[in-house]
């Protein structure tokens, strides 16, 4: 199909903007004539439908329950979701193992040795998202040269034990991998070859110098990406969604930074504040239309409440802690 044909067909399609929360899902559909149609549904209503976002689109298109949604009637679908947020708050991510350089198995638990309450007599360590640690016999110098070579096969016994125990998500965090990723690349290939479905690699997820920040972010990504991937796949299949620029519906998701990304690129580390970030952007745009330059937003949902302010520029933080979990990824604040 030519680009001109795609543009012509786009004028005959519906566009949808969706905010999927833990309790309610809000859907706004823009009909081919430009009219806006709002709809609110319970996010979980297993007796009536499998997914609220898909059901909202189906209702606005007046599509029968017994037939598949016609993808030719849909242009774009843009969604903010708290699937990852609630997964983190409720600790409902996938079971995860950490593979880290030998001698550093407790590095992420120790963190930066910060004490939230300096006078507390009993220090309660945060709950870690990973449940198993495998120490990897390898080591790089700070300049990236090899001190101890990697032998991925030496980990096979431990990796098979993970598979046997039902752990399918792995976070790989090796010392100085930001400088030289060769060991992480080789180890990731070996782990994937053994059948692990989710392998998050620190030099790809968060290419930063500091081990703790890089490691924390990689663990979050491994923990949450599988539930996101399953949700995205379900929505894509129901809508017949395709990549941006291709014929067919385009599915995009709001990231924690306030930007949109293609469905196939939506990762756990970028999804923590997907829903709330969309609220901040919408608040700022709506206030601007009304003539306000400074505004405070109060976004109250069924699971969490987010407060934000806007004074002309979007504020973002790189180092963030959500539900007791540290990570380094750009997020609205």
Language model segments and positions:
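N-terminally biased helix-coil "hinge/interface" segments that flank
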Residues: 2-333
């Amino acid at each position: 199909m030519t680009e001109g044909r795609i543009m012509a067909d786009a004028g005959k399609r519906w566009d949808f903007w969706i905010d999927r929360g833990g309790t309610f899902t809000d859907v706004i559909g823009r009909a081919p004539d430009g009219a806006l149609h709002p709809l609110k549904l319970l996010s979980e209503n297993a007796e009536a439908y499998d997914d609220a976002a898909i059901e909202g689109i189906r209702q606005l298109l007046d599509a029968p329950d017994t037939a598949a949604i016609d993808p030719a009637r849909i242009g774009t679908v843009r969604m903010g979701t708290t699937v990852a947020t609630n997964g983190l708050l409720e600790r409902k991510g996938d079971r995860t193992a950490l593979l880290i350089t030998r001698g550093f198995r407790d590095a992420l638990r120790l963190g930066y040795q910060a004490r939230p309450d300096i006078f507390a007599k009993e220090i309660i360590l945060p709950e870690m998202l990973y449940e198993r640690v495998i120490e990897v016999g390898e080591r790089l110098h700070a300049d990236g040269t090899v001190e101890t070579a990697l032998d991925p096969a030496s980990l096979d016994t431990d990796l098979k034990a993970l598979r046997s125990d039902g752990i399918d998500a792995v976070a790989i965090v090796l010392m100085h991998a930001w400088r030289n990723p060769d060991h992480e690349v080789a180890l990731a290939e070996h782990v994937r070859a053994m059948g692990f479905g989710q392998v998050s690699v620190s030099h790809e997820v968060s290419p930063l110098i500091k081990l703790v920040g890089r490691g924390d972010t990689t663990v979050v990504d491994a923990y949450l990406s599988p539930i996101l991937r399953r949700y995205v796949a379900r929505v894509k299949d129901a809508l017949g969604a395709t990549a941006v620029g291709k014929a067919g519906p385009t599915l995009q998701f709001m990231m924690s930074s306030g930007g949109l990304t293609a469905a196939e690129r939506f990762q756990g580390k970028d999804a923590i504040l997907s829903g709330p970030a969309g609220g901040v952007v919408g608040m700022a745009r709506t206030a601007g239309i009304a003539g306000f330059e400074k505004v405070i937003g109060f976004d109250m949902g069924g699971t969490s409440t987010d407060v934000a302010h806007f004074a002309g520029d979007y504020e973002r933080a790189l180092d963030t802690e959500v539900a007791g979990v540290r990570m380094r990824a750009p997020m609205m604040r």
